């Protein structure tokens, strides 16, 4: 698996009030420290703050002020991907969100492949395969039943049931092996 730092637009490609650019990987904090300045325009290492904090300021690309933003810091493994993660909440115009993503790429990240954040969450043990599949199902749900089912699967209901069945099967296998090894001491 590649361990580089990835970035992508997390919101849809449409004009809206807010757009989100997500960054994840070993250099996510290095990237944001190159781009972020506080409300007074001073460079501040937001990466040194506690996990799960929000910072108001501005995103710069070099000396050019790109946009006003909120920056969320999530230190791994306590993030969706279980890696260091940053979310930049900016104004949601398509052009603005693309400019923020370009600044992130200039600062050292690469554009994520479709589904790569979820792939990393799976590979890092943050979610299991059933939950990874449920992410796509939640996104693509077209009715209430499909959405409810997908959310249940995302919360681990299918995985829990599989673990229960696995445990029961292993118990039965142990019972059968014991009966084969010493049939006189097994009562049915």
How would you label these PLM feature ranges?
Residues 1-148, 152, 156:
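A glycine-rich (often HGG/GG-containing) alpha/beta subdomain
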Residues 144-188:
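Flexible nucleotide-interacting loop at or near the entrance of a catalytic core
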């Amino acid at each position: 698996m590649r361990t580089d730092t990835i970035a992508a637009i997390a919101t849809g490609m449409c004009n809206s009030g807010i757009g989100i650019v997500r960054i994840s990987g070993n250099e996510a904090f290095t990237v944001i420290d190159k781009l972020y300045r506080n409300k007074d325009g001073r460079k501040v290492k937001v990466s040194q703050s506690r996990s799960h904090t929000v910072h108001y300021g501005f995103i710069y690309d070099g000396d050019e002020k790109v946009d006003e933003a909120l920056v969320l810091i999530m230190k791994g493994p306590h993030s969706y991907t279980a890696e260091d993660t940053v979310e930049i909440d900016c104004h949601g115009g398509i052009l603005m969100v693309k400019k923020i993503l370009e600044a992130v790429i200039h600062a050292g990240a690469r554009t994520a492949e479709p589904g790569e954040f979820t792939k990393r969450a799976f590979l890092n043990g943050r979610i299991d395969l059933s939950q990874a599949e449920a992410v796509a199902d939640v996104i693509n749900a077209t009715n209430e039943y499909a959405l409810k089912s997908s959310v249940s699967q995302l919360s681990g209901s299918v995985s829990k049931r599989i673990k229960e069945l696995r445990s029961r099967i292993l118990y039965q296998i142990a019972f059968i092996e014991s009966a084969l090894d010493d049939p006189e001491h097994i009562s049915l």
